[in-house]
Regions:
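Short, low-structural-confidence N-terminal segments
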Residues: 1-88, 92
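Peptidyl-prolyl cis-trans isomerase
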Residues: 34, 68-174
């Protein structure tokens, strides 16, 4: 009887411990400096890197077979003949994209940059257009509207940063 009661208590405890468990993507996957990398932003950068690799694929390579394509070798520079394994190329390009976004955001903030309501609206409209056009693909890859908005806002920051640094009233006018 005691063993049955103990087994029941253990089963209930186990059941309750699993009740709150769900498998989900974490909100953030890391940071570069003060720049928090959301899971969506990481996935968007990775998706973009994979698409770049697909553009570099030879005619005999099938980028739609992801598992096989990641093991393939692509030519990354036709002039030098430099090659890379797709999985390595995607990892490197993903990292490079995230580092660039972090650097843009940090520099924009360091120079006191703030996006105007018009700039935010433009970025958000473009993000919605991107979701209207590619939403099924983005959603299937774990990328939502808020991620695309954040990415497009960073692109607007990038454009504004160029003017803040090199514009007529910039830090280093050209």
């Amino acid at each position: 009887m005691k063993k049955k009661l103990l087994a029941l208590v253990c089963a209930l405890a186990l059941t309750f411990s699993f009740a709150g468990c769900t498998i989900s993507t974490p909100d953030t996957v890391g940071s570069i400096g003060d720049f928090e990398i959301t899971s969506g932003m990481y996935l968007l950068a990775q998706y973009g890197a994979y698409q770049q690799a697909a553009q570099l694929a030879g005619s005999d390579q099938d980028a739609s077979d992801v598992k096989a394509f990641l093991k393939e070798t692509i030519t990354t520079d036709s002039d030098s003949g430099e090659t890379a394994v797709v999985s390595d190329y995607v990892a490197q390009q993903t990292q490079q994209t995230l580092e660039t976004l972090a650097a843009v955001d940090a520099r924009f903030k360091a120079l006191g940059g703030e996006l105007t309501a018009e700039q935010l609206s433009t970025a958000d409209r473009y993000a919605q257009q991107m979701m209207d056009q590619y939403g099924d693909t983005y959603t299937a890859n774990g990328i939502g509207l808020e991620t695309v908005k954040a990415y497009e806002r960073l692109q607007v920051e990038h454009t504004a940063l160029l003017d803040m640094v090199y514009g007529p009233d910039g830090e280093t006018p050209v």
